[in-house]
A protein has these predicted regions:
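Nucleotidyltransferase catalytic core that binds NTPs
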Residues: 1-152
Length: 152
């Protein structure tokens, strides 16, 4: 199973989906966007570096799971290599419409490449007390969220 993202300012929303991935699969591969892939984002200067994001992700995995069940790999395209991975059986994604659409697009690329399609597992995003999704963008803007106020 693969779950990919930027994982900037690793937050409870990311952790919720990672936990789901580990419950659903024996092996979890986490694709982490590189700095190069993010260089055109408008708030790029506020996004943690690849090394910082990698370290936070690894620390979280080590604190909750058997590290042997996971891997972290860099991604530099929207597909993150999922369009060419021969042994990929499932992609876990948030319920963000653009992310779900991208998963379907990658599945079509896999078919075009002669590979079997993967299962798309959609996990609802963690919401804040205002009903909006918890996100790294909101955290970068300085919004503060307390774990006891999050809605799963």
């Amino acid at each position: 199973m693969v779950f990919a993202g930027t994982f900037d300012h690793l937050h409870e929303g990311h952790k919720h989906i990672i936990r789901a991935a580990f419950k659903l699969s024996k092996i979890v591969a986490l694709g982490l966007t590189t700095d190069r892939m993010l260089e055109y984002k408008s708030d790029r200067k506020l996004i943690q570096s690849y090394d910082e994001r990698y370290a936070e992700l690894k620390k979280f995995i080590q604190s909750e799971f058997d590290v042997e069940r996971s891997s972290i790999f860099p991604i530099e395209t929207t597909e993150g290599g999922a369009d060419k991975m021969k042994d990929l059986d499932a992609l876990i994604v948030s319920d963000e419409i653009g992310v779900v659409q991208n998963a379907f697009d990658i599945n079509q690329l896999r078919i075009d490449n002669g590979l079997k399609r993967f299962h798309i597992i959609v996990i609802p995003r963690v919401r804040t007390k205002d009903g909006r999704p918890l996100s790294s963008s909101r955290i970068r803007r300085g919004e503060i969220f307390h774990e006891d106020e999050l809605i799963y």
